[in-house]
Amino acid sequence: MEEVNVHEDLKGVILYAKPEYDDEVKQDWLILVESIKRERHFRSNDLHIYRHASYGLRNGVFYCGEIPGNWGFANGFKFYLPTEKQKIEFIKKIAKEGYKYISVLNKLVKKT
């Protein structure tokens, strides 16, 4: 898969997190959520955090809503473009399992 850098001020990001965590992944996720909550520019409809089983990548899967059709896997905060088949399978999985989301903020905050 092609790897591209993620701009730290991306808006309209949808971030998917695993519903089941080992302690290390859970800690990383809590750090990320707290970092996002501390940001001052709050717009509830800009960043949606989902509890969703990822493809086994540590920090889950995200979709950048500002760039139409720009789907990606997040591992750390590097961005990987999936195949069309992977996108379709992922959409079907979300539709089937019906995960709820929490609206949080307007940008993805890099983990320190």
Where are each of the predicted segments found?
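Short intrinsically disordered terminal tails
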Residues: 1-11, 85, 109-112
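Short coil-to-beta transition motif at edge beta-strands of beta-rich domains
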Residues: 4-32
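Intrinsic-disorder/low-complexity loop/linker signature
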Residues: 9-12, 23-25, 47, 60, ...
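Assembly/interface hotspot detector across virion components, adhesins/toxins, and nucleic-acid enzymes
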Residues: 14, 19, 53-55, 99-103, ...
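Acidic, low-complexity, intrinsically disordered interaction modules
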Residues: 25-88
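Mixed-charge, Lys/Arg-enriched low-complexity segments
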Residues: 75-112
